Amino acid sequence: MGKSQQRKGAAGERELAAILGQYGYSIDRGGSYSMGEVPDLTGLPGIHIEVKRVEKLNVMEAMEQSIRDSQRMQDGIPALFHRRNRKPWLVTMRLEDWVTLYKAIQGETKAGQSRDNTLSIHSQNYLK
């Protein structure tokens, strides 16, 4: 990866961290120079954040990287956050992971736990 690509990736990580910070999440950068030793961003427990800030993205390759890294790091559901110039941020997930999150949100009880224990998240912490 060239230095300009690394700079753009680091800028994308900082940009996304700032946006998530505006939603109230305390996000830390792992550093784009870590070469996969730590996640790109941390601060959403249960979600492995992979950030791509490129004009041409091979979504399947990037998602496979996110899946591999999330399995290796055991830090949560793989989610690919990506955007192109002058375009909004998008999030790509496997359907099964999206359904898991959706079931947890829909099945949440007053105690804050999902009825089917699919994933113990609190929707107010993840979705605003």
Where are each of the predicted segments found?
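Catalytic phosphate/metal-binding cores of nucleic-acid and nucleotide-processing enzymes, i.e., regions
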Residues: M1-K128
